[in-house]
């Protein structure tokens, strides 16, 4: 039977050693689902609230016992006494949103609500004897995503003196996901060798990418291109580059202040100068995607950037849109960006996550399913990417099990789909004039 009989949350640790919420859901027939909630480092100001305890004597204030209590003492009784079916995903999500009663899930915490939302979906898939991607996407979920592999970490994700937060490779020339993963891995290991020969550090950052002390942005880009070529692939044909600028992390009082991360040699740019700078990089290097190139509140700057390079570069809104359909709708109406980053914990339920993906795709925007810098062994985002035919996933570099777990899950899904599996490569960027 599909009726939920137990919902239980506990405090566990994420990949950064910080507490996070784990939720388990059980039905009367014994179907079971478990979910672990991720956490971000650079967060948009309009994100749903991640509830932390604030008790400095415990986990330096980052405990999540309040969120856990909200699941066990408020949400769980509502679900169990309401005799909700595990198949009633939308009803359960809407009930939790109403129970919270705030616009940003600040009462119960998005980390509490999301844990329940995903655990319910996993229990439903278990009840039906289906893989999660098939339960979420039906028979039509078959497209494997192009991986955006963050092989160099900067900004808030590392101690490297570079403002941009992520430097990514995208193996669009591969014919299968399995092949794309191999290409990325070979480039990653070639990059490590190049860094070692230069006497640069090969320690990795939060998302598994290297965080060496490059001389600047262009040094990082050119070194990555060197690694692509050393691995035997063609930059700009088989493998493209991408940035997550995370510009909100160094934007203040109308100025993009690179000195925050790059020291006294870091430039200070106006919005117009930031647009010019990004266009210069696009003209010079094989860049296909730029995330958060402008500050989340600099909509005029976003408009300029979109008009300037939006026909040839994917412009992804992360802090800009925060997986929120109200903000995304405004962006679509005003021609801001051409893609949305999808982070389940930015909005807090699977229902709202799927609504955002659907809205983007209907408007001709791409949707890039993404991890957070604080991750776990949970692989739900891999299943979401396939279920929604998103075509792109961003889940870190080629090291750290919290990142590799998602890649391995995609390998399993591709195997299960067998001949129906698709990997569209460059065609996944349907928002560009290619």
From Swiss-Prot:
Protein residues bound to Mg(2+): 244, 291, 318
Keywords: Cytoplasm, Glycolysis, Lyase, Magnesium, Metal-binding, Secreted, Virulence
Main location per the UniProt record: cytoplasm
Annotated catalytic residues: 207 (proton donor), 343 (proton acceptor)
GO CC annotation: cell surface; extracellular region; phosphopyruvate hydratase complex
Cofactor(s) the record lists: Mg(2+)
Residues passing through the membrane, by range: none
GO biological process assignments: glycolytic process
Binding sites annotated in the UniProt record for (2R)-2-phosphoglycerate: 165, 343, 372-373, 394
Catalysed reaction equations from the record: (2R)-2-phosphoglycerate = phosphoenolpyruvate + H2O
Cofactor stoichiometry and binding remark: Binds a second Mg(2+) ion via substrate during catalysis.
Family statement drawn from the similarity comment of this UniProt entry: Belongs to the enolase family.
HAMAP family recorded: Enolase
Name of protein: Enolase
Native organism taxonomy: Bacteria, Bacillati, Bacillota, Bacilli, Bacillales
Protein encoded by which gene: eno
